[in-house]
Amino acid sequence: MTYQQFLTEIQLQIHSLFDTDVTIQLHKIQKNNGVTLDGLTILQKGCNISPTIYLNDYYKEYQAGKSIHNIILHIREIYQAYRPSSSVDVAFFTNFENVRHRILFKLIHYQKNEELLKEIPHFRYLDFAVVFYCLLSSSSQGNATILIRSTHLSYWNVSADALYSYALENTPAQLPADFEPLMPLLNKLMPMPFPADSMEEESETPLYVLTNKARLYGASCILYPNLLDSIANKLTCDFYLIPSSIHEFLILPILPGTCIQDLNAMIHEVNSTQVEEEEILSDHAYFYSRSEKLLTSMSEERTII
């Protein structure tokens, strides 16, 4: 079965599970870094929102031997777990006074998103783009967001500079930074704790995680006023920032003999094998100078003596 045949079959079988009051649609969804995914939405009558269920990975599961029947059952489970109980009043979005407290920012890679950036307000920072979104809701079931586009600014009659001012105030307040050692964090998230020898090894090469409390676009924490300086003072040294994804940075205190070429090679390898394409932030490290209070890109070979 080809991919297009798979999409059609999924849509038909999902439709057979519901009554005629439900609308089943397939959409091409433009994601970060130029990635386009195929999303399935199931709209109940009288409701204007639905979770988007992406089908690309399901096709990989089908190719690996999973039956269409089991895929359909899983999609139904996902929908039932996340389906909305009521509509969202989108009329409020036309009035900026209703929206301004919900405006937040996030970081994406500049070059990988040049086409998208033609349509949205943004500011360049190093090799990143600072872009904006409206956080409609956030819960354990997921987050509802709207990417802010240039057309929004036109009917709001608001400048990109004003947007940034609101986001700079809102984002740290609504998504507070979370900075903690990597291994204790992993132990909290994993069902089984890491062995003691792993903890001892980690203490010799300490790694920290910088994200936000919601783990949502947490890489943007590097924009929070005075945050990097506060981290440098806490560590009492300069440090590297390793872009783990659009949701977090890893912080590595400067160690003698650290080779940037090796560090960047590791980042590239992890991005290629472990991180979803749409969640990649960058393929090299960054350096924060405690004395200069300055963040710089470290894309070239360099060794710290």
What are these regions (language model features)?
Residues 1-32, 38-40:
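N-terminal alpha-helical "arm" segments
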Residues 2-10, 67, 71, 159, ...:
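Short amphipathic alpha-helical segments
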Residues 8, 202-217:
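Short low-complexity stretches enriched in small and charged residues
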Residues 10-18, 75, 79, 167, ...:
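Hydrophobic, Leu/Ile/Phe/Ala-enriched alpha-helical segments that form helix-helix packing faces
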Residues 18, 22, 83, 87, ...:
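Residue-level signal for secondary-structure boundary elements
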Residues 22, 112-116, 213-221:
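Short charge-dense sequence patches
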Residues 27-209:
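Charged, alpha-helical interface segments at or near domain boundaries
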Residues 213-305:
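C-terminal structured domains
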